[in-house]
Design a protein with these regions (language model features):
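C-terminal nucleotide
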Residues: 2-17, 21-23, 30-34, 39-71, ...
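Short pre-catalytic strand/loop immediately N-terminal to key active-site residues, enriched for Gly-Thr
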Residues: 75-87
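DPxDG-like acidic metal-binding loop motif
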Residues: 89-112
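Alpha-helical scaffolds flanking conserved acidic
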Residues: 114-116
Length: 208
């Protein structure tokens, strides 16, 4: 049984400190941006959904349909997003979350949180090749978090009398390419990654 329209939403995020080093097991602090959202609507279509393997949205829908064991699904997605793409604000993770929620809503299927995380991370593998999991975790959280890859995360009580200015330079970022650049540096990158990890720990101590 399906609905006429399936709807899913998700919010964006911003990394305060620890960008890229988090891929290598160092901590990062990330903040959810609750008011910057994306909405996905799943509606009926005349032809079956087609998979485009380089597209995060397509992979998120495919992973959802595969999990639900639905083949030749005649659906299409409509995305309405206030999250700028390629700006480090978790656009791909948020779109994946919204799309997965919309597909499950359309088919009126239960979506446990752990299943949502698994499906989002599958889609993120396509977008970023070797994601830390930080984007997905923050876009699924309503609180700031300190995150360590393959270890876990802790929520932070952040009550600071301060402002964080998020400015758009107009320059696109490419997470996959940035990760590849760091990888190409090999051992030469390790001192910088370690230093960034220490700065993140100092920032967490200051916040606490």
């Amino acid at each position: 049984m399906t609905k006429k329209v399936g709807v899913g939403q998700a919010h964006s995020k911003i990394i305060l400190i620890g960008e890229h080093a988090v891929v290598y097991g160092y901590p990062a602090i990330s903040l959810p941006l609750i008011e910057v959202e994306v909405t996905c609507k799943v509606v009926p279509a005349e032809s079956p959904w087609r998979l485009y393997e380089e597209d995060t949205l397509s992979m998120a829908v495919y992973a959802s349909l595969e999990h639900l064991n639905i083949k030749d699904a005649c659906i299409r997605c409509r995305i309405d997003s206030a999250i700028p793409e390629k700006r480090g604000m978790g656009s791909s993770a948020a779109i994946s979350i919204a799309a997965i929620r919309a597909v499950f809503d359309y088919y009126q299927a239960e979506l446990p949180h752990h299943v949502l995380e698994i499906l989002v991370n599958r889609a993120e593998m396509i977008a970023h090749m070797n994601p830390s999991g930080l984007d997905a975790k923050t876009c699924l959280s309503n609180r700031p978090i300190c995150f360590i890859k393959n270890v876990g995360f802790t929520e932070l009580n952040m009550d600071l009398s301060a402002y964080l200015v998020i400015a758009d330079t107009g320059v696109y970022g490419h997470t996959r390419e940035a990760i590849q650049v760091v990888q190409s540096k090999g051992k030469d990158a390790l001192p910088f990654l370690h230093a960034l990890g220490e700065l993140t720990q100092q920032a967490e101590d200051a916040i606490r």
